[in-house]
């Protein structure tokens, strides 16, 4: 492979590092550019999500480059949701009918560093930090970067933007006139809080993803290897009950004492975390096309960022990398054919998980605590046990398989019709039994 065939990957986050590994294994020389300093030598940004949920799609991508065992060594399996009511005891809801399948809480930084180490160790990958893309010629492949030493230019035969939801590559393609985009932001934002270890141990059950559903607000907590939990509070960004309305220590303490009373004694730095951690934005990014001239392409969040409520952002981006690798195989490494094929294969799937993630937000915030929801989940798990392989819940198909997201949506629509009928019958039967019992008492 000659020097002119070098591939530039812009963004050394999760997707970019994995992509660099896959391309290098194909024999390409890869230049991996990152706007930040080397993350292995610094500390994470305050308030930046420090853990994520890794499931089968992400594990499949890691397995293909031999990194699954290393990454999973520090993973914490979560086999279900622990629902925390305002009053009363928490209730565990299993993710799978068998109860033995789990999604995995992983340190974002540790995962990024493992992928970065793997990429940097390959002889045909070079990594350039502190390189912020400020110019791109899509037809010529020439890039301009802002660095601490001033502006520098570089040229690549193919430029791939793996630089996240705020992608500079996508911005350059927009300026060029090569694509259109839509950014749909939620009225909700998020703020991260911390539950430290209690007496050196986890303060909550580490085998569950904890959810505090409160209707207008919601909080989740994921375990970390250091026995802490990272909590994420989701709340409207503006209004009378929102992040904007709450600022004084007394008001913060009162809010949590009222809505999240079991959290207060577990989070001694609650007020400080709330006051100093930033409010993050939540939104869905869509754009088309994902490539221009067969030599500049977008992948992962740069092409299709989603809200985090299905825990599929990183998993979906990793699956993108696997699919692009497959397209290069089928197109004999002809990028002008592989990039359009990649978009054709992935765009419907990206839209499907974007919609499912938004729907899951409503489910987590409003429905998980309701008796009807619990009955429906019990019916689903019963059907999974009674019809193994023939009936599979949406959550299992998304999290524990590599079934294409769009196919999952189609299959689940048909299944939900069955579940709805059975659940309605169960509720009616229960109501009839109650009425009969009351009648006998009279």
What would you call each of these model-derived segments?
Residues 2-15:
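Beta1/beta-strand and adjacent pyrophosphate-binding region of the FAD-binding site
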Residues 3, 326-442:
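C-terminal helical "tail/cap" subdomain of flavin- and related membrane-associated enzymes
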Residues 7-9, 30, 296:
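Conserved hydrophobic helix-helix packing surfaces used for dimerization/oligomerization
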Residues 12-20, 25, 161, 193, ...:
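Conserved mid-domain beta->alpha element of the FAD-binding
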Residues 15, 38, 166:
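Conserved Rossmann-like nucleotide-cofactor binding loop
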Residues 24-47:
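Glycine-rich FAD pyrophosphate-binding loop
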Residues 42-118:
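Active-site-adjacent segment of FAD-dependent monooxygenases/related oxidoreductases
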Residues 117, 122, 131-135, 140-282, ...:
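Conserved FAD-binding catalytic core of PHBH/FMO-like flavoproteins
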């Amino acid at each position: 492979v000659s020097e002119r065939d070098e591939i530039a990957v812009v963004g050394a986050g999760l997707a970019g590092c994995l992509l660099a590994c896959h391309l290098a294994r194909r024999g390409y020389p890869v230049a991996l550019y990152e706007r930040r300093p080397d993350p292995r030598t610094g500390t994470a940004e305050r308030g930046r999500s420090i853990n994520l949920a890794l499931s089968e799609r992400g594990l499949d991508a890691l397995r293909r480059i031999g990194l699954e065992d290393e990454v999973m060594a520090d993973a914490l399996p979560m086999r279900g949701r622990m629902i925390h009511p305002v009053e009363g005891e928490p209730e565990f809801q299993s993710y799978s009918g068998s109860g033995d399948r789990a999604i995995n809480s992983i340190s974002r930084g540790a995962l990024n560093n493992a992928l970065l180490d793997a990429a940097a160790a390959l002889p045909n990958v070079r990594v350039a930090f502190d390189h912020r893309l400020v110019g791109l010629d899509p037809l010529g492949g020439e890039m301009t970067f802002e660095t601490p030493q001033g502006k520098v230019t570089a040229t690549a035969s193919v430029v791939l933007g793996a630089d996240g939801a705020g992608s500079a590559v996508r911005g350059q393609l927009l300026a060029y006139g090569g694509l259109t985009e839509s950014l749909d932001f939620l009225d909700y934002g998020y703020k991260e809080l911390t539950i430290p270890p209690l007496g050196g141990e986890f303060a909550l059950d580490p085998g569950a993803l904890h959810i505090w559903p409160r209707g207008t607000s919601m909080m989740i907590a994921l375990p970390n290897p250091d026995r802490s939990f990272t909590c994420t509070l989701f709340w409207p960004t503006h209004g009378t009950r929102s992040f904007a309305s709450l600022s004084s220590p007394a008001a913060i303490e009162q809010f949590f004492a009222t809505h999240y009373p079991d959290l207060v004694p577990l989070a001694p730095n609650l007020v400080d975390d709330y006051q100093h951690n930033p409010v993050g934005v939540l939104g869905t990014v869509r754009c088309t096309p994902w490539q221009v001239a067969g030599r500049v392409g977008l992948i992962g969040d740069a092409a299709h960022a989603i809200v985090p409520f299905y825990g599929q952002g990183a998993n979906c981006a990793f699956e993108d990398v696997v699919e692009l690798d497959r397209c290069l195989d089928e197109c004999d490494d002809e990028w002008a054919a592989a990039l359009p094929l990649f978009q054709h294969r992935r765009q419907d799937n990206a839209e499907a998980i974007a919609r499912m993630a938004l729907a899951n937000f409503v489910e987590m915030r409003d429905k998980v605590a309701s008796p009807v929801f619990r009955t429906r989940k019990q019916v689903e798990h019963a059907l999974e046990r009674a019809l193994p392989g023939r009936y599979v819940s949406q959550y299992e198909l998304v999290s524990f398989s590599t079934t294409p997201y769009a196919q999952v949506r189609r299959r689940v629509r048909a299944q939900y019709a069955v579940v709805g009928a059975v659940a309605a019958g169960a509720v009616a039967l229960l109501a009839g039994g109650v009425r009969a019992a009351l009648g006998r008492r009279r």
